[in-house]
């Protein structure tokens, strides 16, 4: 009775995922049918988790040679440090291992300084290498050292400021979340003749470090893990029905194949050549019929009679209902049970 609380609620059998132009960044994910009200419940919960709770990587601080604080300007650089830091915050990063990691950028002008100019470090990948960080004039030079770490959600620059940080190390606002945008809508949908069900549509954009489909999967796992504490009972165990062999009009031992009997090679080959497959086929043969089998002699006959006698069987028996229509299936089930 208690299981009906959750077992009898309708739930979607699978998700319908439609990738966008860039399948690593954009996707529309549809779940249907859902019980009335569950579209809003799940959509709102998943959206909040997608935006706030997934792990990602981001720059936490930057050191620029010759710069003491963010309200400075750099000779030969068109942007001031405040603008440079705003651009740095937009660098999308994917990091497989744990942080923190150091990354260095060094470039001479003239020209634009891009995120892709940052030197590669092990398992750290820049996902938007064409992002412009700043612009250098002729003869200008810039060197920056970045600190990259992992985390979740949004962390303000003040929280990234270490007490023992050296002079010139500028903390940066860190947006760790790999999900940039999430929207959802709930519509009516049909299941059979019933229209009173929900259809949940999620539209997700990530920074490329995580696919939208994986982002939803991880978010659902987080929600599942948080809800486990509210389940204060053990689910009653289901009694699994044990499949049984149906009532047979004959001894089920007749479904055993003759090649499983301990016969000599000569006797086994004679039965095989005469297309005798099951014991049920064999016992309906008379002694005279067996002796007419090519290469089958009295010695083989006596051997077979002895083996059958040990099973309480003999040649020349009449078997009602043999052979059954589904003999191969019955033989397999017999093998599993006996």
Swiss-Prot record:
This is DNA-directed RNA polymerase subunit alpha. Residues 1-234 are annotated as: Alpha N-terminal domain (alpha-NTD). Keywords: DNA-directed RNA polymerase, Nucleotidyltransferase, Transcription, Transferase. The keyword Transcription applies. InterPro entries: DNA-dir_RNA_pol_insert, DNA-dir_RNA_pol_RpoA/D/Rpb3, DNA-dir_RpoA, RBP11-like, RNAP_asu_C, RNApol_insert_sf. One of its GO terms (biological process) is DNA-templated transcription. Belongs to the RNA polymerase alpha chain family. It comes from Beijerinckia indica subsp. indica (strain ATCC 9039 / DSM 1715 / NCIMB 8712). GO terms for cellular component: cytoplasm; DNA-directed RNA polymerase complex.
